[in-house]
Amino acid sequence: MRNTKKVIAAPAAVATLVGLAACGSSNDNGANKGDADKAELVFWGWDSGNSMKEILADFEKANPGITVKFNNTGTAEKTSTALSNAIAAGNGAPDVVMLEDPTVTQFAVTDGLVDLSEFGADKLADDFAAGPWNKLQYNNKPYALPIDSGPEMFFYNKAVFDKAGVDGESIKTWNDYYEAAKKIRATGSYITNLAGTSNDYQPFTAQIWQAGAQPWKVDGENITINMTKDEGMQRYIQFVQKLIDEDLVDAKTPNWSDDWNRELNDGTLASLTIGAWMPINLMTGAPDQAGNWRVAQLPQWEEGKEVSAEDGGSALAVTSQSKNQAAAYKLVEYMTHGEGAQTMADTGTFPSLKKILRSDSFTDPTTESNKKTNDYFGGQNVNEVLSAAAQRPTEKFQYLPYNPYAQTAYGDEVSKAYSGDITLEKALENYANKLAEQGKQQGYNVTVK
């Protein structure tokens, strides 16, 4: 039975999270749909675009019988921890919660979230980009709706590429990328960094996703881990090991470190494969390279293909503890599929809704925000490239129901391959064994191939 799974709560000593639980829904597990037009909702999330006040005011105006109390958790990690505590306690969860996409499965599998197909969300599938939509399914049912997305992109420094005699626009396949890496290394720069820390986990999942890998499969109580024999994983392992062996990547500098920003700013790192939300981070982290960076579609494993993958993204869900589920879903749909989605996009959130991605306003180079970004990217229409990527097809990809552990364990084990202690294949074998052990501790039947 699914309720045999352990819900691991974080230490209750974290005062801010205890406070959040106190501000959660006072309802117990006898949740029901409630009145769709009259409710007092509690909503946990973060507000990176500073748009929440406007969105919720507009929602309440359109739904005069519903009020929303927004508790700003500050970060995705704090939100997940607080929700874990509330589920473990059996009370205190909000009506609506914002989550990072990879964590949705862990809460769905423990019955912490509502299957949104009960409210017709499954009929919205074609309205969203495939990548973010596919990530939020559990047992082929939507347990959250995407509020933003992060299609994986190829960002490159044209000045560094030009110095190496490489045309960035000519890189269509990963073999092209490998050949470019050799030329760039000869100039003293690296084509990119790969350090294998926990900060590199999301790019790792995006890269294996695009390679068609299925390193783990979750089927109810059963988890199958196939970390090194899976065809897509072998494709990825052999390619990355070649980059490591030939010293073509900076294997010491982790993403988001001070050294990482310094190397992006001085040209040591010539490119990144990372989510579409990256432009603002380059603009602030590598100001000296203004005018030099460009963005292109992700290189492909097979020539002529147009397969994408997701790196990051967040979503809105309705909790099982809520007794206002119908009204809560109204808010979720408004923010992800209704007018609130446009407001989010207007304030800098990268959209997941196709109609916004295809809109003239999103790619209009004359808007203040777009002009600033395009100037940094040498006059390129950045959103036009990003929009095309978001609408590319993606393979289906699952996350483990204990994804936070998977991220930490990835850094513990895989970093050893980048430091040269062991091969990447051996590191991933060790990683698979740790994932299996954790799954068994949580009550799953785990098979390692």
Question: What kind of feature is each model-predicted range?
Answer:
Residues 101-152, 178, 207-208, 294-296, ...:
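Hinge/lid segment of periplasmic solute-binding proteins
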Residues 181, 222-253, 298:
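Glycine-centered hinge/linker elements that transmit conformational signals in sensory
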Residues 162, 386-449:
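Conserved C-terminal helix/tail region of periplasmic/extracytoplasmic solute-binding proteins
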Residues 58-128, 163-165, 263, 267-271, ...:
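Extracytoplasmic "Venus flytrap"/periplasmic binding protein-like
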Residues 1-41, 61, 426, 433-449:
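Short, low-complexity disordered leader/linker segments with a strong preference
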Residues 278-289, 302-408, 446-448:
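C-terminal lobe and pocket-closing loops
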Residues 93-95, 124-160, 304-309, 392-400:
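A structural signal for short loop-to-beta-strand junctions that line the ligand-binding cleft
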Residues 35-47, 66-71, 95-96, 143, ...:
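Short, well-ordered beta-strand elements
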